[in-house]
Amino acid sequence: MNNTITRLRGLYDRFFTLISYLQSPFLLFVRLYWGWQLIQSGWGKLHHLGNVTEFFTSLNLPMPAQTALAISCLEFFGGIALAIGLFSRLTAFVLTINMIMAYVTADREALFSIFSDPDKFYAAAPYTFLIASIIILLFGPGKFAVDTLLERWFGPSTPPISH
């Protein structure tokens, strides 16, 4: 009995050791895919600022022209930073706040149906960007990122937190 448990534990450990090798490629995929999507979204907004300003005006956002420019730049440059893995967690934090605000201002009905009609929440435009941002915020950019190179060259920016 004890030998079986030891063998199962060994198989379990080896399986999750192998799976852990997929973490950085997965994070790279998340950063590249959603970074590219943000770049395209920001680029489109930058080239149609009048339409974005008009939309933000219809939402009664303060300073709609300045907000449109700021959000467009955030999505474009934030998408670039996310894709290459530069200042990843800071970028992901700002993008997370941006996507939450997109829900609050532009997709309020979807936000309030998170429990009553989750499909509406999942189908809203900010959802995948929000999830991608949260993934990078919580898990970092992975090994294949500019942040990782900077950390190797200059050392960690803050001491690691013990769990």
Q: Can you name each region flagged by the protein language model?
A:
Residues L49-P62, R89:
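Short juxtamembrane and helix-loop transition motifs at transmembrane-helix boundaries
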